[in-house]
Amino acid sequence: MTEEKLDTNSFRFFGLGGSNEVGRSCHILQYKGKTVMLDAGVHPAHQGIASLPFYDEFDLSQVEVLLISHFHLDHAASLPYVMQRTNFQGRVFMTHPTKAIYRWLLSDFVKVTNIGNDNAGGVSDENLYTDEDLAESFDRIETVDYHSTIDVNGIKFTAYHAGHVLGAAMFQVEIAGLRILFTGDYSRELDRHLNSAEIPTLPSDILIVESTFGTATHEPRTSKEKKLTQLIHTTVSKGGRVLLPVFALGRAQEIMLILDEYWSQHAEQLGNGQVPIFYASNLARKCMSVFQTYVNMMNDKIRKKFRDSQTNPFIFKNISYLKNLDEFQDFGPSVMLASPGMLQNGLSRDLLEKWCPDEKNLVLITGYSVEGTMAKFLMLEPETIPSINNSDVSIPRRCQVEEISFAAHVDFRENLEFVEKIGAPNIILVHGESNPMGRLKSALLSNFSSLKGTEDEVRVYNPRNCVAVDLEFKGVKIAKAVGNIVDEMLPVVDEDKERPYNDPEDATSEEQPKEEPQDADKLPEEREQPEVEEERVISGILVSDEKNFDLNLVSLSDLREHHTDLSTTVLKERQTVHVDCRNELIFWHLCQMFGDIEVLVDEEGATLTKVEEDEKNTKPGQLVVRVMGDIKLSVVDHVATLEWTQNVISDAVADSIVAILLSVDSSPASVKRSSHSCNSNDHPGESETLWKIKQIAKLFNEQFGDSFTLLLDKESEHSDNENIKGSVTIGKNYATVNFSKMAVEDCNSNPLKGRIESILGIGADLVAPLC
């Protein structure tokens, strides 16, 4: 594949094998910089390097996770090659039964797989991989349980029952919220020992589904079993031999369950053991022990039989095992299940060449036959077949050939039903020959034609090998607030504080009984949440987790706690300015400009609030204040020192303070405040401050009428006016106003408090001098 940068919002599917063909299944998924490989098989119709997927077309070092759906050779046989002979460095996962069978199956495969395949029939001495490669790769394989989710650097995947063979799994892969379901080979039919394929609980955005049988429909299971047993019974009754080419594991066990039961039920008709059944495979006994071990992972029927009879259902009464043909005495009728299922080589091919000239014999194909294999060729009923030892030698074929598919693959009806239940808007077809796959694509598009042109339109793709499918996904990015910043974001939900301000005319009305909320019986997280204030700015740090694709909004103080891999550095600014004025004048200018002034130390050195350790033992004449909550100003001996945490807002405020300090001694406002002028009011003997307070009180009388009271007595009129207050009472809402400080000191209603502060601001502007 040509190396090109994939857009971060684009998902790419790239088939290295198994696209528009059956065999060498291998698919690449790429999204958000993550790469997943699905399966690593070989093509049963080819040998050596030619049987491998097109690994040279992709840089396997990019693959982080490789998922093996099941143990069949066309899905798993090139895994040791990938792990030991390429630059692959990722992690490999499969289910427990798959790993248990994998080693035995591939040990046998090593013996018959060679690099190269010349037209003359010669075979090279070098294999695709060695037993040492297989052993080393085996130790690196990790197992996964059904329904458990594993997270590898942000790639999450969950295994589900696929129903194809023991241990077969469908994988739902999730990357940055995008879910891809890969079915592998799957079956929705409940057979004698396996569960049918499951429907994942979470929806999928992309479905990668097999299309082995295209639009074909299977016979009912009971009909197939009856036809199978009748054909075999008829053949052996005539003295013939029956060859059933099967894969060593999978459908072979299903057919053995059928035949063992039939032989027990028809023992007399079959000569009470005179017609033997053999299972010929080098791996027979080894792999059958795996089936006997994992009975509890099979369906309820087989588990019940195991519990009730206390005997393992895979210990057969009427079936014997053959390791090789040297142990087989070929006298009279018999039934032979032999591997491999494609008749390319091995025991099944040897028996085919031995039995095919006899017209009494029967070859019964029970699985799917791949193009280019002897099994597929035999279904054409040729007059002769080539010998495996010498292709120039032709062997006459007179035996009967029948096909009864027990392949654990979905037919069109089952596939369509599954696709509809998954409901994925994007479907990618794999594991199917071009013609059946093309017919399936047309049938699916026709089925979903009513959705074309809508937001729910279903798109179906059937790419060839090494042809990429790019899909655009623009997901919504949601940041999760974590830590202390949550408190800032939550609206005030206290009912009293949220109660709107009532008009004075309604103050005497009786309070209505409070109704219980309709969702009082619900959990807090299920209740309807109060609306959050709009246009409210929340400051924090947005942290993106590249591994898990999570976005977290945290405050600076929480950064280390919630993201231990991040370090923080706080930059403090300090600036010194010489001033030639009194501290009181500086404080007055700061109050006029900013209002929000926290006095830490006054001019006499007395602490007004809790003083930090470094601020104790202050000198007389020192002034220490905090402006806007962040900027600390210390004035000692006509030297002003500012300290603040560096950020955009604090920098701007600090610049404003410096400007005030540099101009405070020459400001007209400073001159006026420092001089002792006559009162500007018309009431001799009354201070200017008291006059201003009374003017502002008039505004309160206009706004609140009798609900407002100015707390002013004769002693206050002649005092220094440092603590003149007023009160506002409206129904159950009340507020205390300190006119000396121009602030609301005590209020139980936010709306009322806001209104009073607004009136105070207007009053301050009205009584302020024009200069």
From Swiss-Prot:
Gene, per the UniProt record: YSH1
Bias kind Basic and acidic residues: ranges: 511-530
Record GO biological process: mRNA processing; sno(s)RNA 3'-end processing; snoRNA splicing; termination of RNA polymerase II transcription
Keyword entries, A-Z: Endonuclease, Hydrolase, Metal-binding, mRNA processing, Nuclease, Nucleus, Zinc
Signal sequence interval, chain numbering: none
InterPro entries cross-referenced by the UniProt entry: Beta_Casp (IPR022712), CPSF73-100_C (IPR021718), MBL (IPR050698), Metallo-B-lactamas (IPR001279), RibonucZ/Hydroxyglut_hydro (IPR036866), RMMBL (IPR011108)
Region ranges (Disordered): 493-533
An example Gene Ontology molecular-function term: RNA endonuclease activity
Active site: 409 (proton donor)
Gene3D superfamilies given in the database record: 3.40.50.10890, Ribonuclease Z/Hydroxyacylglutathione hydrolase-like
Localization (cell): Nucleus
PANTHER family hit by this protein: CLEAVAGE AND POLYADENYLATION SPECIFICITY FACTOR FAMILY MEMBER (PTHR11203), CLEAVAGE AND POLYADENYLATION SPECIFICITY FACTOR SUBUNIT 3 (PTHR11203:SF11)
Pfam families per the UniProt record, alphabetical: Beta-Casp, CPSF73-100_C, Lactamase_B_6, RMMBL
Keyword Repressor: no
Residues that coordinate or bind Zn(2+) 2: 74-75, 185, 431
Protein name stated in the entry: Endoribonuclease YSH1
Residues at which Zn(2+) 1 binds: 70, 72, 164, 185
SMART domains tied to this protein: Beta-Casp, CPSF73-100_C, Lactamase_B
